[in-house]
């Protein structure tokens, strides 16, 4: 019985870790290690206090988080750039004086709407490294914050170097006097990434998951370590942007000599803006993208199941991809046209590319050229999938030359491997590429990481800075379902086409030769009824004459003059 009571007390104690702040008359009281929810408003700035600080605590790290509205945390009541920080995720480090047991600071917001926030105060000892303790770039003397910047292509985080810990009342170790193992140059920085649930843009979910990224133990248990930096490296890391997908980043500074660690202030992003005019964080997406991707998916789905039988339709699909991809890269890099205009021009250019490939097959009948295009499209998807794996994050592939040469070799390897069995290559391309177009269409309606298999390659071709970005995407329940749908469509399409084409010629005959043979047969065989069909030119003249007759007035019949009496 007493064990049950202890268990209940433990659960209640754990639940109190996420409590509302004790607030009265603009006064907030915090406890070490307890996450506190409260609301900040512009009219009522708050003074925060922490009491009963233990004597073995050397410094405190306070942090406050909100979803997209800015909050300000300051050492003093008067806001100055050197004593305050403003943003969605901001924090301060408090170096404690001897015998200090109480610490105060100030919180406020300039936003007109109330800001729902969560905050926590963490304590560290003299053996723990101090995040941002060797700041030379930002305004605060000691800056534990991570500064985030994003665009459509990449998200970049940067932070100030840390310093080794020291006791109360001691002088801080110099940052750049020496580079030995007794200085801050021995420190290591582990960069972690944590994905929020896909499609979840709620404030409550973000504030809850941020609690998993504040303390060292929880960060190491919940997030994925992306890269480790030394003191010689720049404290800047880039990631591929995922618009509409919530991501939390944090940095753990580790002292290998003392085996101690400390966490910076975690920072989050959705790679989009909640308060923009377009509201681009909130679905639905662009109508133009939905129309384009849906029509493209319908053509791809038809190719997946019937592409080899309807050879010319498949060639149009392949030519559309081939020319449309390169044309979109060209106009995006060389012009400043709006997205909708570029999408329409890409659709027109892709259609021209498809018609050209069909026309070249009809006139010249060069099977090798057509299958080279088909094989390269399949090879492009295979190569994109290869670099979608952790292999793409190797440092050697951050060089554009190495990346594009390797990418091209993998893409060329696919048609070379299937050089002796072109029909199998064609059916595989129909099934895999055609079914993947459905994945791209799904991405225009709901987020799926699988679309970034090819979108990351497109981003790298469009933006030179993307080469240094780490490519990581969430793989959650929706992605497993869509991956199963993709695999099911591909396997079904390939199987049906292989069974249907048994006993048939590998490819249709040359259309132009068939047309010439048919024309010669009509000329030589006078018993053929089609021999008596007039030439095309005479038939066209006849059609034009009949159309003209429709617009001519009907002539009256009989006498035009009155009868003589």
From Swiss-Prot:
Return the GO cellular component terms, semicolon-separated: plasma membrane
Asked if the Swiss-Prot or TrEMBL record annotates the protein with the keyword Lyase, the reply is no
Domain of life of the native organism: Eukaryota
Q: Where in the cell is it found?
A: Cell membrane
**Principal localization?**
membrane
Which controlled-vocabulary keywords does the entry list? Cell membrane, Glycoprotein, Membrane, Signal, Stress response, Transmembrane, Transmembrane helix
Q: Which residues form the signal peptide?
A: 1-21
Matching InterPro entries: TM7S3/TM198-like_dom (IPR025256), TM7SF3 (IPR042502)
The protein in question is named: Transmembrane 7 superfamily member 3
Origin organism is Rattus norvegicus (Rat)
Provide the organism lineage as a comma list.
Eukaryota, Metazoa, Chordata, Craniata, Vertebrata
């Amino acid at each position: 019985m007493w064990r049950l009571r202890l268990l209940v007390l433990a659960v209640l104690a754990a639940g109190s870790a996420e409590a509302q702040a004790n607030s009265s008359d603009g006064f907030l009281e915090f406890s070490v290690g307890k996450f506190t929810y409260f609301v900040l408003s512009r009219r009522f700035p708050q003074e925060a206090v922490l009491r009963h600080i233990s004597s073995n605590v050397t410094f405190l790290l306070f942090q406050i988080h909100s979803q997209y509205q800015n909050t300000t945390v300051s050492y003093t009541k008067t806001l100055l750039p050197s004593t305050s920080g403003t943003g969605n995720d901001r924090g301060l480090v408090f170096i404690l004086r001897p015998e200090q047991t109480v610490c105060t600071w100030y919180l406020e917001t300039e936003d007109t709407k109330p800001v729902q926030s969560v905050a926590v105060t963490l304590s560290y000892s003299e053996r723990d490294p101090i995040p941002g303790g060797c700041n030379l770039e930002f305004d605060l003397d000691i800056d534990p914050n991570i500064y985030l910047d994003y665009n459509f292509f990449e998200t970049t985080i940067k932070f100030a170097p840390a310093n080794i810990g020291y006791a109360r009342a001691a002088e801080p170790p110099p940052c750049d006097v020496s580079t030995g193992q007794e200085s801050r140059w021995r420190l290591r920085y582990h960069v972690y990434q944590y994905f929020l649930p896909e499609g979840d843009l709620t404030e409550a979910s973000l504030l809850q998951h941020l609690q998993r990224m504040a303390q060292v133990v929880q960060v190491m248990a919940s997030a994925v370590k992306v890269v480790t930096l030394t003191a010689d490296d720049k404290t800047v890391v880039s990631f591929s942007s995922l618009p509409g997908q919530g991501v939390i980043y944090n940095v753990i500074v580790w002292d290998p000599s003392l085996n101690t660690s400390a966490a910076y202030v975690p920072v989050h992003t959705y790679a989009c803006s909640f308060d923009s005019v377009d509201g681009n964080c909130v679905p639905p997406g662009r109508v133009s993208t939905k129309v384009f991707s849906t029509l493209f998916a319908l053509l791809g789905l038809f190719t997946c199941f019937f592409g080899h039988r309807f050879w010319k339709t498949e060639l149009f699909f392949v030519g559309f991809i081939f020319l449309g991809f390169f044309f979109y890269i060209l106009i995006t890099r060389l012009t400043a046209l709006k997205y909708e205009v570029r999408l329409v021009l890409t659709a027109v250019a892709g259609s021209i590319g498809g018609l050209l490939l069909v026309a070249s097959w009809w006139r010249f009948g060069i099977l090798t050229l057509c299958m080279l295009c088909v094989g390269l499209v399949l090879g492009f998807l295979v190569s994109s999938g290869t670099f979608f794996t952790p292999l793409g994050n190797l440092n050697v592939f951050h060089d554009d030359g190495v990346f594009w040469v390797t990418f091209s070799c993998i893409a060329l390897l696919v048609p070379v491997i299937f050089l002796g069995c072109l029909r199998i290559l064609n059916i595989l391309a129909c099934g895999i590429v055609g079914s993947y177009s459905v994945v791209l269409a799904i991405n225009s309606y709901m987020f799926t990481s699988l679309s970034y298999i090819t979108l990351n390659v497109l981003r790298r071709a469009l933006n030179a800075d993307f080469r240094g970005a780490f490519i990581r995407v969430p793989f959650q329940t929706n992605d497993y379902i869509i991956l199963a749908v993709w695999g099911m469509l591909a396997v079904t399409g390939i199987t049906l086409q292989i069974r249907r084409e048994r006993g048939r010629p590998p490819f249709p005959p040359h259309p132009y030769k068939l047309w010439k043979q048919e024309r010669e047969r009509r000329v030589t065989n006078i018993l053929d009824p089609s021999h008596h069909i007039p030439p095309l030119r005479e038939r066209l003249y006849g059609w034009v004459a009949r159309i003209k007759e429709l617009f001519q007035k009907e002539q009256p019949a009989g006498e035009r003059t009155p009868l003589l009496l």
